[in-house]
Amino acid sequence: MRNTMRHFAVAISLMLAMTLPSFSQQHPIVEKDYVAYLFTYFTGNHISEEAVCYAVSMDGYTYWALNDGKPVLDSKVISSTGSVRDPHILRSQDGHTFYMVVTDMVSDNGWDSNRAMVLLKSNDLVNWTHSIINMQKRYKGQEKLKRVWAPQTVFDPEAGKYMVYWSMQYAGGADIIYYAYANDDFTDLIGEPKPLFIPENKKSCIDGDIVYKDGVFHLFYKTEGHGNGIKVATPRS
């Protein structure tokens, strides 16, 4: 395992070397400098499969697993439940820092069993700091909260901050996508979570993914329990 992790670290270092050629902290990286894609994933719905894994691609279509397909982080160390799901990595605006968010959850305990997410930060994709955000412990009035799912992060250019968004469900209600801004250290959320998107039919929506293209933010999301599928929403103004 020690040799495997060493090879994994070397692979990540080589990938960073390819994507960060001779840049300093004063020179933000632009898209033309990227030569590889990093895909972060988990493999299933059991505790042994709920962990962060890496795969790399040169074309965005064909990926090969790093670290022999084994987890690159110990879920028991970074989470409160012992498992994590739904990993999402975002490269920062300066190109040198990486933010990852994951669901803190053991699905074997039930789909309504989790109340937390984890915020992680790294400069090399290997060594990560982490902070657990338990919604019921962090905020008052969360007694009816049932679950916290699939967080992601996007940079808000108007606010100049990184926005974390995720799905939450309260007893008797639908899954709704909420948001809050992260603090500068990416260790906590600022202020109370607020609804980001509620479908017109007021039904559940989960697994939000925001993509910025041609001056417009596109929110892709999955409907749950009512004509399941992937939908997209854009701002009205």
PLM regions: where:
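Beta-rich carbohydrate-recognition and catalytic domains
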Residues: 25-148, 154-237
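Bacterial N-terminal signal peptides
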Residues: 9-21
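N-terminal secretory signal peptides that target proteins for export/translocation
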Residues: 1-5
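Intrinsically disordered, low-complexity regions enriched in polar/acidic and amide residues
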Residues: 6, 24-25
